[in-house]
Amino acid sequence: ISADGSRYEGNLRGGKQHGKGNLRRADGYTYNGDWVNGVKEGIGKITMSDGGTYEGEWQAGTIVGQGVAIHASGERYEGGFRNGKRHGKGVLATPAGYEYKGDWVDGQATGQAVIKDVDGAVYEGSVINGARSGVGKLVHPEGFTLEGTWANGQLNGTGKIISANGDTYEGDLVEGRREGSGTSTTSAGDTYSGQYLNDQRHGTGTFKGADGYAYEGLWAEGSAAGAGTVTYPDGSIQTSTFVDNLAEGPGKITYPDGSTYEGDWSAGVIEGQGRAT
C-alpha cells in the first residue's frame, strides 16, 4: 500500500511490480495485468473511476498495440493504438448505432473506411478527421446514392447522384449542390446537359425530352431564359428569346412543311407584328 492509498497485489522483483499483478488506486482506477520493472508491459486491463475500460497491449507503460476500449458512455473501440490513441485499423461503435470501420491516425479517423450512420446511410471511401473527404460512395436507406469526390462531408468536385426515383446527375458539384457542368437524366428519359448554378440549370444547356421536345440555349434559375432554339415533337423549329420557358419578343418558327412565321411573341403565343410565308 502506497502513501497515496494505492494498493498493489502481485509479483515483485527488486521491489518493483514484475510479472502478474493488480493495482488499485484510491480514486477507483485499477490495472490488472502484466508488469516489467514497475511498468505496465504486455497484456493488461484498466478500469477508470467512471467505469470506462481498456483491455489489451501495453508497451513501456503506454497503450500500444491491439486492444478494446469501452467508454463510460457505451462507446466501444476495438483495434490498434499508439501512444494511447487510436492508430491503425479499428472499429468504433456507439450506442446510437454509428459505426466506423477503417483507418486511424493519432486518434483521428483518417484514411479508408466504411461508415454506417445512425440513419442507416453507409459511406465507403476516403475520410479525413472523421469527415468524408476524397473519393467515396454514400448509399442512403431512402434509396439515393451519392458518389464522387468529397470535401468536409459534402460532394465537392466531380460526382454522381442517383435519386430514389431513378433520376441521375453526373458532373460538377460544390458543397453537395449541382454547380458547373453536368448531365441530368430522369427516369422518364428526359435529359439536360449543360451548366448549373446553385443546384439549378443556369447558363448554356440543352434539354431533350423523351417526347421529342428539345431546347438549346440560355437558362436562368432553372428556366429557359434568353436566346434559344426549340425543336418540337412534330419537327417544327423555333428560334427566339425566352422568358420563364416561353417565347417573348421577336422570333421565327419553321414548320415541317416549310412554311414559316417570323415576328413577335408574347408569353409563348404569336402576338403583334409578324410575317407568315
Predicted regions and their residues:
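N-terminal compositionally biased, intrinsically disordered segments and leader/signal-like regions
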Residues: 3, 95, 111, 185-187, ...
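Conserved anchor residues at repeat-unit boundaries in beta-strand-based tandem repeats, strongest
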Residues: 7-18, 30-41, 53-64, 76-87, ...
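Solvent-exposed, well-ordered amphipathic alpha-helical segments
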Residues: 20-25, 48, 71, 140, ...
